[in-house]
Amino acid sequence: MMVHAHPDDESIVTGATLAKYAAEGAGVTLVTCTLGEEGEVIPDDLAHLTSDREGTLGEHRIGELDKACLALGVRDHRFLGGPGRYRDSGMMGAPTNEHPRAFWGADVEEAATLLAQVIREVRPHVLVSYDEHGGYGHPDHIQAHRVARRAFLRAGERAMPGTPWQVRKLYAIAQPVSRIEESIARLREESGSFTPPARVSDIARGTPETAVTTRVDATDHWAAKALAMRAHATQITVEGERFALSNDIAQEIDAVEYFTLLVGPTPRIQHGEYETDLFAGL
């Protein structure tokens, strides 16, 4: 089970992993916490959808997410608490952080209980979300981490009505600094029509190498990831092996994805090596 903040996050940072496990026959569930109502819109012909105009971007992005899930082979998708229960909070410090339905302001225990109910229904062995920094500091990503971490415990508590289920492993999505730096070097040579990134922070906060435990090589599923990213047309421009968000900064579409094991059996690996399977040790 993967827990993401907005439609498109699942494809950008975990799309290849989702496609790999879905293709291998694993039960894959995607939980999205908001509709992404505050996203910027790239195509001019869809600019009318934004929250400061028609305000229908969230509904439109449901359709984009449906297409992305189809591309990835994800058959079980849920919105946390149902579509629209929690709203995109916008970037940190934005007035939309104070919206009464903003996910950033949601009661963590309440949201975690909703997620725990899904966990008990689906009974996953592995739960994946963000690290405590939310990858790049977006409030909804930080909140998704908090909610997923609490739900990981909540689902196994006997004090919660229903049959407990204890997920075996909890992961945070990782973006190794060295991997980003290597990508930046390539993009400085060839970024297509996009602006080449100047520094690591142009792409992500970056994860220290010592914190990265797991490397999933899903190269065979690169095309599925790229197709899923194309489905999020309001948010992502795909050009060959590269893409850009609304900031027009080039990034590579990478089908090798990284994670940090937060809770679970310690990987039996040599120093300097990675665990290669999210289900290892189960």
Curated annotation (Swiss-Prot):
Pfam families: PIG-L. Keywords: Hydrolase, Metal-binding, Zinc. GO terms for molecular function: N-acetylglucosaminylinositol deacetylase activity; zinc ion binding. Its cofactor is Zn(2+). It is an enzyme of class 3 (hydrolase). It comes from the Bacteria. Zn(2+) binds at residues 6, 9, 141. One of its GO terms (biological process) is mycothiol biosynthetic process. Transmembrane segments: none annotated. Belongs to the MshB deacetylase family. Catalyzes the deacetylation of 1D-myo-inositol 2-acetamido-2-deoxy-alpha-D-glucopyranoside (GlcNAc-Ins) in the mycothiol biosynthesis pathway. This is 1D-myo-inositol 2-acetamido-2-deoxy-alpha-D-glucopyranoside deacetylase. It comes from Nocardiopsis dassonvillei (strain ATCC 23218 / DSM 43111 / CIP 107115 / JCM 7437 / KCTC 9190 / NBRC 14626 / NCTC 10488 / NRRL B-5397 / IMRU 509) (Actinomadura dassonvillei).
